[in-house]
Amino acid sequence: MIFMDNMKEKRKINVLFVIIHMEMGGSEHLVWDLIRNLDRSVFRPHVAWFYQEKPLQEFLDLDVPLFFIPKINRLDLSVMGELSGIIKDNEINVVNAHHYLSLVYSFYGCKLKNRSKLIYTEHSEWEVQAISGKWLFVGRRLLRYTDAVVGISSKVTKCLQDTFRLPGNKICTIVNGVDCTMFSVAHNTEQYKIKYGLERDDFVLGIVANLKKNKNHIFLLKAFQKLRQRNNNLKLLIIGQGFKGDPEGSEEDIRNFITSAGLESSALLLGGRTDVPDILKALDIFCLTSCKEGLPISLIEAMATGLPVIGTNVEGIQDVIIPHSNGYLVELNDEEQLVQALESLIEDSSLRHEFGGMSRQLAYQNYAFENCLRQYQSLFL
């Protein structure tokens, strides 16, 4: 019986997703969603990663093989060997490498030591634009033998094509999708506010973003501080994990600002959470004030919940928010503009309702996960 089960498993297409960090950022969220929804009668998924050894509970709950490969040096050749061994031992048919670093480390095991299909997914223009010198030369050589290249937006795809001189038949755009069925409009936000220890009449802002400098939480906190001086019922929920040993000290900076501004009881750090769909139902407005983004999944999830959204006018975010339709775009670090945008929505419930309805419509129309899943499964075959 065990022998027959093993034979049945071997007939499946073994897919190895390679990510850099074990966190719940955009690329990791995409991999998590893909694994949850892949046709398990056809595909058997695996995951490998390089940083943050302890797997997230979300990935443990997937019940798939997980492989932590510690990357010690800037160019750690041992990672290539370990990945190659994983590919061989698990009879991996397809490797989906997310981000350029994962591509570099996956290529040896895929194309030189084994004969696996290699698919490279890139999530941001700015990461591609940062590749230069010898690494640009290396990338062009590797991608010549890579089976398919995916950009998560048309802008990322064009950037990849221009940077690496890729032929059109090798590259495609697969927009990151959101499983909209997990998110629904809260017809009674009060019950969710109470669930998370808030008052019924609190007006709640929220951000879902890991505690990294690029996510620019301090910008939002400064605007929130000004608004609190005029409205004591305002609360801010900050959902996202910090990281031990973060060289930028992002979480410490955020905590210090909250303390120095006297916001301990109104700006609440909730950490990394698995109940984001319910937390979003407690919000009145969703904000994302990043310095740069790929395609922000948390923003799309907020839209699927039917929330009005405010974000910085930077790549990634500007592709999702339609100004004066489902929310507002504000210039990076322009505190007064952010305050004004928030005030206009805080003071106008009908406008919040209008923007929220359009948010939900856009999420279903442009970012339904079914389209994303179908295209990836087609590539994996």
State where each predicted segment sits.
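N-terminal strand-loop element at the rim of the active site
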Residues: 12-13, 17-81, 86, 156-157, ...
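A conserved mid-protein helix/loop that constitutes part of the nucleotide-sugar donor-binding site
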Residues: 25-33, 203, 207, 212-226, ...
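Short hydrophobic beta-strand element within catalytic cores of glycosyltransferases
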Residues: 48-49, 308-311, 321
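Short His-centered aromatic/hydrophobic patch
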Residues: 97-103, 122
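A short, well-ordered alpha-helix in the C-terminal region of glycosyltransferases
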Residues: 194, 337, 344, 351-366, ...
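Nucleotide-activated donor-binding/catalytic signature segment of Leloir-type glycosyltransferases, i.e.
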Residues: 251-271
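Aromatic "clamp/platform" in nucleotide-sugar-dependent glycosyltransferases that forms part
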Residues: 272, 291
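Conserved acidic donor-binding segment of nucleotide-sugar-dependent glycosyltransferases
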Residues: 323-324, 328-335, 344-350
